[in-house]
Design a protein with these regions (language model features):
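Terminal low-complexity/charged segments
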Residues: 1-144
Length: 144
């Protein structure tokens, strides 16, 4: 795992907030939201990882987004983590132009948590009915 972390640190050292190894073979690397596209592109194109999925969670501090990647040759999992602190209007740059497979999961996070993925080619309902009330996001704690 150290070799992967050192490659990422060499390339992205100025934008890394925190590196956390919780359980082998997984590492969480935290970035500011504006650095996620560059980090995802590096992990995907340079390290040869595939995107597994992305996840989002409404926390007291903001909306946390994680992009999960697998480096299949080594069996390692790299999770790129970021926190969007503006819960009233959460937004982050989409990575769908870098990784086509991110399109649907970003749509799901947009729909369920209300995160606007800037530059996404097709933000429209995926799981909810088309006339779902605007501004109501089922996984947001303020909707309970």
């Amino acid at each position: 795992m150290e070799d992967i972390i050192s490659h990422i640190r060499d390339k992205l050292k100025d934008s890394i907030i925190k590196v956390e190894e919780k359980a082998t073979p997984r590492v969480y690397i935290e970035f500011k939201p504006e650095n996620i596209p560059e980090a995802a592109e590096f992990v995907f194109k340079e390290l040869g990882c595939r995107m597994i999925t992305a996840s989002g969670i409404d926390t007291p501090q903001g909306i946390e987004i994680l992009y999960h990647f697998s480096q299949d040759v080594s069996g390692k999992v790299i999770s790129l983590r970021t926190l969007i602190t503006n819960k009233k209007s959460p937004e982050i740059d989409s990575i769908a132009h870098i990784i086509k497979g991110a399109e649907w999961i970003e749509r799901e996070i947009w729909e369920l948590l209300g995160v606007n993925f800037k530059g996404h080619p097709d933000l429209r309902h995926l799981l909810l009915i088309d006339d779902w009330p605007e501004g109501k996001h089922p996984l947001r704690k303020d909707n309970r």
